[in-house]
Amino acid sequence: LVRHFVQQGFQTVGMKPVAAGAEMMNGRLLNSDVAALIKAGNVDADLALINPYVFAPAIAPHIASEQAGVKVSLDNIQQAFDGLQSQAEMVMVEGAGGFRAPINRQETMADLAVKLNLPIIMVVGVRLGCINHALMTAGSIRAAGLTLAGWVANRIDPDMLAIEENIATLKAMIKAPCIADVAWGEEPQFIDL
């Protein structure tokens, strides 16, 4: 999505507020998703704004933060987001772990999305069980008072049976447009933005 908006001529930056699973690069922890967001964007923003919380172990972010003795704060994330908004026309925020994944012992990615008042683009890993999971997540997004702006069909299981039928069911039942259908191992081609 970041690359798409850059190609459309927007000053665009990606943000991953909380990331777990990082390696030392030039004396700082860097998560591979964050590196990809930086590469895709066209705004030279401070890494501390793009990724305010980063932890080395590839485990649930709230557990990684506890092990590091760090409390993830929605207010700090809001300040970083506001800083990015002052530098870019588009700030694309990537979650971690799913819509209801905890970021600390009291708050989840859903709370973060509500605080930042973000429209949501849901990524559906197309595999057995994805219909139920996607419909529950879409319902959870709406119950939080947020807009489900669209969804992406990410074909993560190249051997899935009845894949086209599953995607057709998702398109019929999710009350938002499918903005991309990503084949196994390919880059997304956006359908409807």
Regions found by a protein language model. Give the residues of each.
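Short, glycine/serine-rich, charged loops/turns that create anion-binding
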Residues: 19-22, 127, 156, 186
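Conserved catalytic-core segment of NTP-binding enzymes
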Residues: 76, 83, 90, 95-175, ...
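Conserved beta-strand termini and adjacent loop/short-helix elements that scaffold enzyme active sites
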Residues: 50-53, 95, 181-184
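Short, well-ordered secondary-structure micro-motifs
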Residues: 25-26, 61-65, 102-104, 133, ...
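N-terminal phosphate/diphosphate-binding loop that engages ATP/GTP or pyrophosphate donors
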Residues: 2-71, 75, 80-83
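Short, basic phosphate-binding NTP loop
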Residues: 3-8, 38, 165-172, 185-188
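Beta-strand-loop-alpha "switch" segments that mediate conformational coupling across diverse proteins
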Residues: 59, 172-190
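Short, amphipathic alpha-helical "lid/cap" segments that border enzyme active or binding sites
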Residues: 74, 78, 188-193
